[in-house]
């Protein structure tokens, strides 16, 4: 070493234990954290939070005297199904897509038909990876002739956006399509339950008709709320009840949450978190994160009927592999205890 010398000296100049670099876990100090627009309000309500895809989301809202999370979640579910509940769903990925060829583009990335979605309508779509496995699901609404807005699951927001960019830039660069992620630019709330329309009618400006006849199931549109604030309204349901999702620019998010809760007092409105959201989507039979784990096909999830046989799309060929069409593959099913007093614990093994 003395004869040959060394390369340019760089720190560390003497051996350092790897543990000095890694250190012990420092909690969330080195993690970026995103808060939803209703975070401040939720903290004021004593919400319990959970980290989901680098977001902090309200898990449930305990009331004084509730000592177990199930008490809070059961109350939130029951009140939502009986009257109305509000959930912050801002964390869902949101992608604005514009251009003359957006319909054709969406028709190539979703398994179901998107070529003729009418203006003012929303359609639920399923997206596959190239290997035929389910990548993500979500809704896409057509706000105008050449303007669509897509929603994705919270966990896959970045992956889906990256996938769409790859498809456009590498596979179909000639299509007139332009997209941008607006996940953090819009605050979005689910308003669900039998009284959801009555609550929204107190917030939506009077020149916007959201009656059942004017705004039917799966409708979408740009409206105004609270005296002229631009908003987007979607009549979609993650819970099985009459429900809407309303989106405003993020800077209005906190105010809108407070306004919705105040407007819903006469209906005994309840805020609900991710646990209640999960309960209601299971009761509805809606597939979500635990099922979209990268190892399931559309047929495994009972969604084979959505697949169009009249077009090609990403994952179509490999989705028809013999192994994916076996009759003995695991299928998503729902369980209900014979004795309603028996609890099915999460993570239990079926023998």
Model regions: which residues?
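Short amphipathic beta-strand starts and helix->beta connectors
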Residues: 75-82, 127-137, 173-175, 225-233
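Conserved hydrophobic/aromatic beta-strand scaffold that supports enzyme active sites
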Residues: 86, 94, 126, 139, ...
């Amino acid at each position: 070493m003395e004869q040959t010398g060394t390369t340019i000296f760089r720190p560390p100049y003497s051996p350092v234990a790897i543990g000095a670099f890694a250190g012990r876990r420092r909690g969330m100090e080195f993690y970026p954290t995103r808060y939803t627009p209703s975070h401040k309000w939720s903290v004021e309500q004593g919400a319990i939070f959970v980290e989901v895809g680098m977001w902090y989301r309200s898990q449930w809202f305990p009331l004084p005297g509730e000592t177990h999370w199930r008490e809070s979640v059961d109350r939130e579910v029951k009140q939502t199904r009986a009257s109305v509940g509000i959930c912050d769903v801002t964390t869902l990925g949101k992608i604005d897509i514009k251009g003359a060829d957006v319909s054709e583009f969406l028709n190539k990335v979703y398994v179901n038909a998107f070529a003729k979605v009418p203006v003012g309508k929303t359609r639920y779509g399923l997206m596959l990876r190239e290997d035929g496995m389910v990548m993500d699901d979500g809704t896409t609404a057509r706000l105008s002739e050449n303007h669509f807005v897509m929603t994705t699951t919270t966990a896959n927001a970045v992956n889906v956006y990256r996938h769409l960019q790859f498809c456009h830039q590498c596979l179909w660069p000639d299509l007139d399509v332009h997209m941008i992620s607006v996940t953090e630019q819009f605050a979005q709330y689910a308003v669900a339950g039998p009284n959801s329309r009555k609550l929204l009618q107190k917030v939506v400006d009077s020149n916007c008709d959201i009656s059942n006849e004017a705004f039917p199931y799966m409708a979408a549109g740009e409206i105004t709320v609270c005296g002229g604030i631009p908003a987007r309204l979607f009549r979609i349901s993650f819970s099985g009840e009459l429900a809407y999702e309303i989106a405003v620019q993020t800077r209005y998010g906190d105010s809108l949450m407070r306004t919705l809760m105040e407007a819903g007092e006469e209906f005994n409105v309840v805020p609900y978190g991710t646990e209640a959201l999960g309960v209601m989507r299971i009761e509805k039979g809606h597939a979500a994160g635990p099922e979209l784990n990268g190892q399931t096909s559309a047929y495994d999830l009972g969604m084979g009927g959505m697949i169009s046989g009249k077009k090609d799309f990403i994952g179509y060929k490999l989705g028809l592999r013999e192994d994916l069409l076996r009759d003995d593959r695991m299928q998503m099913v729902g369980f209900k205890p014979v004795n309603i007093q028996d609890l099915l614990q999460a993570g239990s093994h079926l023998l």
